[in-house]
Amino acid sequence: MIHVPVNANNSELAIRSLKKKMQRELVFRSMKMSRFYEPPSVKRVRKKQESERRHRKERAMRRRMMEE
């Protein structure tokens, strides 16, 4: 659940921060993906690509930590 505090009735700032948080958590992507039926074969390929991307990112982070 995403929580966004609204300070001094500043709703525009709250909406902007909500959009940023939703983008960070990939809410928009998951909403877009669930609009249409996705066959199991396509879903499997997409999940594998996402997993590879995540692992590459983790390896890059580890390398950066080792260099420092």
From Swiss-Prot:
Q: Which GO terms describe its molecular function?
A: structural constituent of ribosome
Report which superkingdom the organism of origin falls in.
Bacteria
The Basic residues compositionally biased stretches are: 54-68
Which is a GO BP term held by this UniProt record? translation
Residue ranges of the region described as Disordered: 39-68
Pfam families named in the record: Ribosomal_S21
A GO cellular component term found in this entry reads: ribosome
Q: Which InterPro entries match?
A: Ribosomal_bS21, Ribosomal_bS21_sf
**Keywords on record:** Ribonucleoprotein, Ribosomal protein
Q: Indicate the family of this protein.
A: Belongs to the bacterial ribosomal protein bS21 family.
- Write down the HAMAP family for this protein, in alphabetical order: Ribosomal_bS21
Write down what this protein is called.
Small ribosomal subunit protein bS21
Q: Which species is the source of this protein?
A: Orientia tsutsugamushi (strain Ikeda) (Rickettsia tsutsugamushi)
What are the leading ranks of the lineage? Bacteria, Pseudomonadati, Pseudomonadota, Alphaproteobacteria, Rickettsiales
The gene coding this protein: rpsU
